[in-house]
Amino acid sequence: MKLDIKTLDGAGAGSVELNEEIFGLEPRADLLQRMVRWQLAKRRAGTHAVQNRSDVNRTRKKLYKQKGTGNARHGAASAPQFRGGGRAFGPVVRDHSHDLPKKVRALALRHALSSKAKASTLIVVDDIKIEDHKTKGLIERFGKMGLSNALIIGGAEVDVNFGRAARAIPQIDVLPVQGINVYDILRRDTLVLTKAAVDALEERFK
């Protein structure tokens, strides 16, 4: 698969041959769904907790005698049916993460890359180095490229000026190539890869 390389100003800068085994697969929605679910579950803090009937600070004394009042039978006021009582079957602190094989995770990333290539929302740029960290200038360059909602993947390290200029732009995410992931690829309309990122990905999946 051949794709044109652009500069940040929208001009042409040659072309690159993309590996069909990485960028030319038929996307499988089931793999992408499993991977996104795994990512979102793994990043949950799991610190949610409520007080059950043994935790609330209320008297354990029986409300009134068992028989003879005509009222329903009740024990302590900490029971869930009372205002101020404990929560029944509420959330507890736990780990939400679950297992997903490493080979499935790697395959899902290739399918995510292929989905962008198939939808023609994959752009390859020669480099993302800029002279200063002015956000206004970068917005103008993105306008020339037609970028308003994009994930931009740099090389092993993202240019400092580019990272600073881009972080103030809404709906623009910037990551080094080792941080590329399925969720961030799918949540943005366009995927922008540098030539260095393409080389690193092809080396990774060799």
UniProtKB/Swiss-Prot annotation:
Gene3D superfamilies: 3.40.1370.10. It holds the Pfam family Ribosomal_L4. Signal peptide: none annotated. The keyword Membrane does not apply. One of its GO terms (cellular component) is ribosome. GO terms for biological process: translation. InterPro entries: Ribosomal_uL4, Ribosomal_uL4-like, Ribosomal_uL4_dom_sf. The keyword Nucleus does not apply. SUPFAM superfamilies: Ribosomal protein L4 (SSF52166). GO terms for molecular function: rRNA binding; structural constituent of ribosome. Keywords: Ribonucleoprotein, Ribosomal protein, RNA-binding, rRNA-binding. Part of the 50S ribosomal subunit. Belongs to the universal ribosomal protein uL4 family. One of the primary rRNA binding proteins, this protein initially binds near the 5'-end of the 23S rRNA. It is important during the early stages of 50S assembly. It makes multiple contacts with different domains of the 23S rRNA in the assembled 50S subunit and ribosome. Forms part of the polypeptide exit tunnel. This is Large ribosomal subunit protein uL4. It comes from Methylobacterium radiotolerans (strain ATCC 27329 / DSM 1819 / JCM 2831 / NBRC 15690 / NCIMB 10815 / 0-1).
